[in-house]
A protein has these predicted regions:
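Short S/T/G/P-rich N-terminal loop/turn motif that feeds into the first structured element of a domain
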Residues: 1-44, 70-78, 96-162, 174, ...
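Short, glycine- and small/hydrophobic-rich beta-strand elements in well-ordered beta-sheets
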Residues: 39-62, 93-107, 157-182, 196, ...
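Small/polar loops that bind or transfer phosphate-bearing groups
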Residues: 185
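A common structural junction motif
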Residues: 84-94, 200-209
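Acidic/polar N-terminal loop/beta-strand segments that form early-domain functional surfaces
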Residues: 16, 52-54, 68
Length: 231
């Protein structure tokens, strides 16, 4: 992971295309996409904007956007949110926002060094699948001492290392959204990822999970691939 990824804002937004969008001719739908994404990329600047397909993994949403920008100043989040809104508002007749999940990166208190399994949000290459969900611990978790929590997290980390091909990004959203974290995984094999989650269900730390739904499973697409699906 690059150093700039250690302090970044990652914003995941889920959209549904409206009936008015589907009434457009194919060429006009392409124009909507190109205009909208050009505006979003301008907002992201040196950051990234990635496109993901949701339907048919879930029935009420079509598209997920992942925007990653550096959060190197107090003004950076406000600048991004303002720019995202300005880029999206002209197209609201065609796209309906459904869900937004976002948070900030920081160093983990349970790991002394960076893991090779950390997702680099600014990396050019993306895995075929992305899984994302909100996550909240119980109050009892935070009332335990650091040593006890560290022991349970060590078990969690050991299991994760068995699945070297799966990468994770943990976003902190305490006091910013309803959840405490946003958990993001990248994988090229959904069956292997499902087995990882199954194994993690049997850890002691699982007792202290308050919420980890809804889960969104998305498929990555390049800009041209996205046009071939939605246009």
């Amino acid at each position: 992971m690059e150093d700039r990824a250690l302090k970044s804002l990652n914003h995941f937004s889920i959209f549904r295309f409206t009936e008015e969008y589907w009434r457009l001719e194919s060429a006009d739908r392409r124009d909507v996409h190109r205009s909208w994404f050009a505006g979003l990329q301008e907002v992201a600047g040196l950051g990234t904007v990635h496109r993901y397909q949701l339907f048919p993994t879930e029935p009420l949403a079509d598209l997920m956007l992942w925007c990653a920008v550096e959060a190197d100043s107090n003004e950076a989040p406000a600048k991004f949110f303002e720019g995202f809104a300005k880029a999206t508002v002209p197209h609201r007749r065609y796209v309906e926002p459904r869900i937004s999940l976002w948070g900030l990166t920081r160093r983990s208190q349970y790991s002394k060094s960076r893991s090779r399994q950390e997702v680099d949000p600014f990396g050019e290459k993306r895995a075929p699948y992305l899984i994302i969900y909100p996550f909240t611990k119980t109050a009892d978790w935070y009332l335990m001492n650091q040593e006890t929590r560290q022991g349970m997290m060590n078990e969690h980390i050991r299991i994760g290392k068995r699945y070297e091909s799966i990468k994770q990004l943990l976003l902190y959203s305490f006091g910013l959204q309803d959840q405490e974290f946003v958990v993001v995984y990248e994988t090229d094999d959904l069956a292997v990822f499902s087995q990882l989650v199954n194994d993690l269900r049997m850890t002691e730390a699982r007792r202290f999970t308050l919420g980890d739904t809804p889960v969104h499973t998305a498929v990555y697409h390049t800009p041209e691939e996205a046009l071939s699906i939605w246009c």
